[in-house]
């Protein structure tokens, strides 16, 4: 019995959000003694204020996140979570033309796959409930990480329980506890205390950026009959060039909406209630008063915080065998690809695959051998994951431009149509849109970028070939028989010749 206890590792997880909670489930399933420390109170308590100071943020759960949750081997958990989601099969673009409101659907995937809108609290509560039922997991809320020694494997937490009196003769300091561990996982968000203390030991390259965009949350209420006011199976976008308004469905038949705009535009909107209403009418047609009344719009804009958007990159994601950081603590990304949550959950799957591969959970190994194996696993994780998280960071920035402007351009629609047609009709090519690769596969993010660039070069070659061939065919026909072809006949002949060229080119690619 003593030998069994000796072989168990002790893991400290900092942060009880979805990513930290999933990490705890993975470790507990492998026999670790797990302790989770969370700065805030119990996240299942509605009175607990989230770190972003809002209470109803919706998340997009796609293939990467679902796969990571399935690998926890808690089928009931993932099934319960998915039952509470709303599938979104594509974007619904809104606009106005000559005074008439219009909307146009753009499917995410030619095969009908969808991403899932899920309430943050629904996901987090399900994970925490599962952890509470796991015997080798302990939850500690209202605990702030104040220090760590990653050579001695010790950490210190202040216990900030509401109503708890300071200890006698403590100069009113809150109680502090010392915790020993074998390794720590830092999953405490973009302003991570775990990362801060790790940087005292590791040489971390760190890049943080605030883009000139603020966001504010709004709500479209259900109809008087308790139904959705607009299609629930789409992510609704009102693109506005420099800004945009989006809406995601919620389980209570409302929509959680977000206004993204530069700080200067927020200042203009806040200068008078009339500016806010008029701006929405001009730039986001059909929102006010059709979906949100002017009074509600003004109240929500005044009440809800106007928050910045942060992105960060860092390397490495670990120090020796003592600590590894995951999720936003390692790679906060902008929300415009819906991959922040999914990338964080995928971190956990990839991390524990490396831990398993390198023998960190080999119970026959000595503690020193397991530490050495864990150090190798952490290094392999950093080597792979830094490249991928930097890639999704860049993709998320690029997608902001696409969402607020590109979705309406003919070039975007043309490329999307061509790529989807190739995916549907010539599957042997392995052709997919970049969005499908990101959202509906587990392909590494860095490889997604490489695939998208290759496809872009092929499409560019195809376009150039088409233009050159068109000119060549027309010149040939006029040179051979300048008077024997009507314009209609010339076009039909040119189309047959060009079609044969395209078929030949893609057949060559398919069988290469």
Curated annotation (Swiss-Prot):
Enzyme class: oxidoreductase
Cofactors demanded by this protein: FAD
A GO CC term attached to the entry: mitochondrial outer membrane
Record key words, sorted: FAD, Flavoprotein, Membrane, Mitochondrion, Mitochondrion outer membrane, Monooxygenase, NADP, Oxidoreductase, Pyridine nucleotide biosynthesis
InterPro entries in alphabetical order: FAD-bd, FAD/NAD-bd_sf, Kynurenine_monooxygenase
GO BP annotation list: 'de novo' NAD biosynthetic process from L-tryptophan; anthranilate metabolic process; kynurenine metabolic process; L-tryptophan catabolic process; quinolinate biosynthetic process
Subcellular location: Mitochondrion outer membrane
NADP found in the keyword field: yes
Pathway in which the depicted protein is active: Cofactor biosynthesis; NAD(+) biosynthesis; quinolinate from L-kynurenine: step 1/3
Chain's role: Catalyzes the hydroxylation of L-kynurenine (L-Kyn) to form 3-hydroxy-L-kynurenine (L-3OHKyn). Required for synthesis of quinolinic acid.
Protein name: Kynurenine 3-monooxygenase
């Amino acid at each position: 019995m003593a030998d069994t206890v000796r072989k168990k590792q002790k893991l400290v997880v900092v942060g009880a959000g979805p990513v930290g909670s999933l990490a705890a489930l993975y470790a507990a399933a492998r026999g670790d003694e797990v302790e989770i420390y969370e700065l805030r109170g119990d996240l299942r308590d509605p009175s607990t204020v989230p770190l972003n100071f809002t209470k109803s943020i919706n998340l997009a759960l796609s293939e990467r996140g679902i796969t990571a949750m399935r690998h926890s081997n808690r089928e009931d958990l993932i099934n319960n979570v998915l039952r509470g989601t709303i599938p979104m099969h594509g974007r619904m673009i809104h606009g106005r033309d000559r005074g008439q409101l219009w909307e146009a659907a753009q499917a995410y995937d030619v095969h009908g796959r969808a991403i899932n809108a899920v309430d943050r609290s629904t996901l987090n509560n399900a994970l925490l409930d599962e952890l509470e039922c796991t015997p080798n997991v302990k939850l500690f809320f209202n605990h702030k990480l104040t220090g760590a020694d990653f050579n001695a494997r010790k950490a210190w937490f202040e216990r900030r329980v509401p109503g708890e009196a300071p200890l006698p003769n403590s100069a009113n300091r809150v109680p502090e506890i010392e915790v020993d561990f074998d390794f720590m996982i830092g999953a405490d968000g973009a302003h991570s205390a775990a990362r801060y203390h790790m940087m005292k030991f590791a040489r971390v390259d760190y890049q943080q950026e605030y883009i000139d965009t603020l966001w504010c949350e709004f709500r479209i209420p259900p109809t008087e009959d308790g139904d959705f006011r607009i299609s629930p199976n789409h992510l609704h976008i009102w693109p506005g060039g420099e800004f945009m308004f989006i809406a995601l469905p919620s389980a209570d038949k409302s929509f959680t909406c977000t206004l993204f705009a530069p700080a200067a535009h927020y200042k203009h909107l806040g200068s008078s209630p009339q500016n806010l209403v008029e701006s929405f009418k001009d730039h986001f047609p059909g929102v006010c008063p059709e979906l949100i009344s002017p009074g509600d719009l003004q109240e929500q804009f005044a009440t809800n915080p106007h928050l910045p958007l942060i992105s960060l990159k860092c390397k490495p994601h670990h120090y020796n065998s003592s600590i590894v950081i995951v999720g936003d603590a390692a790679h906060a990304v902008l929300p415009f690809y819906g991959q922040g949550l999914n990338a964080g959950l995928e971190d956990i799957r990839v991390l524990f695959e490396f831990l398993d591969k390198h023998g960190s959970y080999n119970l026959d190994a000595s503690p020193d051998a397991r530490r050495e194996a864990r150090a190798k696993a952490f290094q392999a994780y950093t080597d792979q994951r830094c490249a991928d998280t930097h890639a999704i960071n860049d993709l998320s920035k690029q997608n902001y431009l696409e969402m607020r402007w590109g979705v309406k351009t003919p070039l975007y629609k043309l490329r999307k149509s061509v790529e989807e047609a190739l995916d549907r009709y010539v599957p042997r090519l392995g052709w997919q849109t970049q969005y499908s690769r990101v959202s509906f596969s587990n392909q590494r993010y860095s490889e997604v970028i490489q695939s998208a660039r290759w496809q872009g070069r092929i499409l560019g070659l195809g376009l150039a070939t088409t233009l050159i061939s068109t000119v060549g065919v027309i010149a040939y026909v006029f040179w051979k028989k300048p008077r024997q072809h009507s314009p209609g006949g010339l076009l039909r002949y040119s189309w047959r010749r060009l079609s044969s060229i395209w078929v030949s080119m893609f057949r060559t690619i398919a069988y290469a």
